[in-house]
């Protein structure tokens, strides 16, 4: 077997059972991986120097094809209400079949860190069949110094083989596509899909399992910090604006998707960003556009002009879930450390497809826990397979597919952190105004940015607030530069009776969804629920 590149020879591929390989390329950088991806026909070049790849049938995550080994430990530590299980024996069969399938292949290996805080990071080794997948995960996780690679000993191992086809009867899975995690052995197997996001979310899921035991809250969020050292966290599902809103030229970016919050503050899990880029423009999102238009960026399912090879970011013919992966250092004001102090503000983003939520609301600590456990948003087109238009969704902790443990574990940790550090909490609707999806329109990003700026710089604290009659939270009545009507959703609807009917319906959905958490939360959190009786007055 031919091996090229720097790595720890005492902890090579053979330690994981990989054998009879044609070769391994260890820890290659972007130029080398570009060469291999282009030579192998995996990807093409854009006119701006980005590597552009198609992911085939799978243009989003497949949460129904994700499985975790159920053993004596995970029997009691896993949240089986939200996760699917396979037996240790089924995983071992799958693992051996992966090893057999890899024989004769040339693989790409990356040694990386999951987590910017050395006290809590997990050393991760990723074997990939495709060169562009190797570049993707090298971009998304954190890269060790070259001098540290020779002594790198992995704790978590991912094997990513898109050409592998699982057998549901043999492997205990659902289809030919599979993501399987064994927390005891710290091994992740990904087969049958070229969608690169499965790799990063598998590392995220692993950190979500281990970090609560060590007093760190893992979060599906973005984070940035202001000139005064004021850290802000933005919770939200894919497509709600985490990446866009955290890329603020007046604030330092910590990260766009995954973070931990512990006794020393906030730290990024990653070293790159993974931005939705449908309708990406230099006017609306200049920093993300620039980062996606240069050497080192990886574009997924983005259509190129046949002649100019310029990306057509407005073209969603392959999927609405077009993506751009780029290193954090491509953002001019990104933090080199990926770490920041204790948050001053927590923002919960919701793409309200009903168009009845205000653009911003201030939450009490009890309301914050209620809305964190509810995780209301809309499934935005293309983020998961089979979703072609936004539909209402409650995803607990704003990341249900990535939660190995019971949601109450994360909710209680958030409650304590908010209380201990006197954090201000906000709910922001980045979804629809002037009507529900189909009749209204998306909330203008300029409005959202103006409201967020006022919240984060403290000026919104001094505003006059009204109590929303449906949801009970505090909504500002006026803010310079923001149309007053947009702050009161009912005024943006032509049909006020239809607004009332729609708002009441959403209140009922919140109550129905939260019923499963009522026995696990304190009375003040139950009292923070939207109230149909209020809405009916």
Swiss-Prot record:
Residue stretches of biased makeup (Basic and acidic residues): 311-321
Residues given in the record as substrate binding sites: 61, 195, 201, 323
Entry keywords, A to Z: ATP-binding, Cytoplasm, Decarboxylase, Gluconeogenesis, Lyase, Manganese, Metal-binding, Nucleotide-binding
Location of this chain's protein in the cell: Cytoplasm
Any GO CC annotation of this UniProt entry: cytosol
Presence of the UniProt keyword tRNA processing in the record: no
Enzyme Commission (EC) number: 4.1.1.49
PROSITE patterns the UniProt entry points to: PEPCK_ATP
GO aspect biological process, one term: gluconeogenesis
Enzyme class per UniProt: lyase
Binding of Mn(2+), residues: 201, 220, 257
Pathway the protein takes part in: Carbohydrate biosynthesis; gluconeogenesis
Family annotation (InterPro entries): PEP_carboxykinase_ATP, PEP_carboxykinase_C, PEP_carboxykinase_N, PEPCK_ATP_CS
Co-factor: note: Binds 1 Mn(2+) ion per subunit.
Record-listed ATP binding positions: 201, 220, 236-244, 285, 323, 448
Molecular function terms, GO-annotated: ATP binding; metal ion binding; phosphoenolpyruvate carboxykinase (ATP) activity
Record's catalysed reaction(s): oxaloacetate + ATP = phosphoenolpyruvate + ADP + CO2
Region: Disordered, residue numbers: 311-342
Cofactor(s) the record lists: Mn(2+)
Source taxon at top rank: Bacteria
Family label: Belongs to the phosphoenolpyruvate carboxykinase (ATP) family.
PANTHER family in UniProt: PHOSPHOENOLPYRUVATE CARBOXYKINASE (ATP), PHOSPHOENOLPYRUVATE CARBOXYKINASE ATP
Purpose: Involved in the gluconeogenesis. Catalyzes the conversion of oxaloacetate (OAA) to phosphoenolpyruvate (PEP) through direct phosphoryl transfer between the nucleoside triphosphate and OAA.
Protein name: Phosphoenolpyruvate carboxykinase (ATP)
């Amino acid at each position: 077997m031919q091996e090229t590149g720097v790595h720890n020879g005492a902890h090579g591929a053979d330690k994981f059972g990989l054998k009879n390989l044609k070769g391994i390329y260890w820890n290659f950088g972007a130029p080398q991986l570009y060469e291999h991806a282009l030579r192998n026909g995996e990807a093409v070049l854009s006119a701006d120097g980005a590597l552009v790849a198609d992911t085939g049938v799978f243009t989003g995550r497949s949460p129904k094809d994700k499985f975790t080994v159920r053993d004596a430990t995970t029997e009691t530590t896993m949240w089986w209400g939200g996760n699917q299980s396979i037996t240790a024996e089924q995983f071992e069969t799958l693992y051996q079949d992966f090893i057999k399938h890899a024989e004769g292949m040339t693989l790409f290996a990356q040694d990386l860190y999951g987590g910017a805080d050395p006290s809590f990071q997990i050393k991760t080794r990723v074997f990939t069949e495709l060169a562009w997948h190797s570049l993707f995960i090298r971009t998304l996780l954190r890269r060790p110094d070259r001098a540290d690679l020779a002594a790198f000993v992995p704790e978590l191992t991912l094997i990513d083989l898109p050409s592998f086809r699982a057998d549901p009867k043999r492997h205990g899975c659902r289809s030919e596509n599979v993501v399987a995690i064994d927390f005891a052995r710290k091994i992740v197997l990904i087969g049958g899909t070229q969608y690169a996001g499965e790799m990063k979310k598998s590392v995220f899921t692993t950190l979500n399992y281990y970090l609560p035991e060590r007093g760190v809250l893992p979060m599906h969020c973005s984070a940035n910090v202001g000139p005064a050292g004021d850290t802000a966290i933005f919770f939200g599902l894919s497509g709600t604006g985490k990446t866009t809103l955290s890329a603020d030229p007046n604030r330092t970016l910590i990260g766009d998707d995954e973070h931990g919050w512990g006794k020393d503050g906030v730290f990024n899990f990653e070293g790159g960003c993974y931005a939705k880029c449908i309708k990406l423009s230099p006017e609306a999102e200049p920093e993300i556009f620039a980062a996606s238009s240069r050497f080192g960026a990886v574009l997924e399912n983005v259509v190129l002009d046949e002649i100019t090879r310029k990306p057509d970011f407005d073209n969603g013919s392959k999927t609405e879930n077009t993506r751009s992966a780029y290193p954090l250092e491509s953002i001019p004001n990104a933090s080199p450390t990926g770490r920041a102090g204790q948050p001053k503000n927590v923002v919960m983003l919701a793409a309200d497809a009903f168009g009845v939520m205000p653009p911003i609301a201030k939450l009490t600590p009890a309301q914050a826990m209620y809305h964190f456990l509810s995780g209301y948003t809309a499934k935005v087109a293309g983020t998961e397979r089979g979703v072609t238009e936004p539909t209402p969704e409650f995803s607990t902790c704003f990341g249900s597919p990535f939660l190995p443990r019971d949601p109450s574990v994360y909710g209680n940790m958030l409650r304590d952190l908010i209380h201990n550090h006197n954090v201000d909490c906000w709910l922001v609707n980045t979804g629809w105004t002037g009507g529900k999806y189909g009749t209204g329109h998306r909330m203008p990003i300029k409005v959202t940015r103006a409201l967020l700026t006022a919240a984060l710089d403290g000026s919104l604290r001094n505003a006059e607030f009204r109590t929303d009659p449906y949801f009970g939270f505090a909504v500002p009545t006026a803010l310079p530069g923001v149309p007053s009507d947009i702050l009161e959703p009912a005024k943006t609807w032509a049909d006020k009776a239809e607004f009332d009917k729609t708002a009441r319906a959403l209140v009922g959905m919140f109550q129905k969804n939260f019923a499963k958490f009522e026995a696990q939360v304190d009375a003040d959190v139950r009292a923070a629920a939207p109230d149909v009786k209020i809405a009916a007055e």
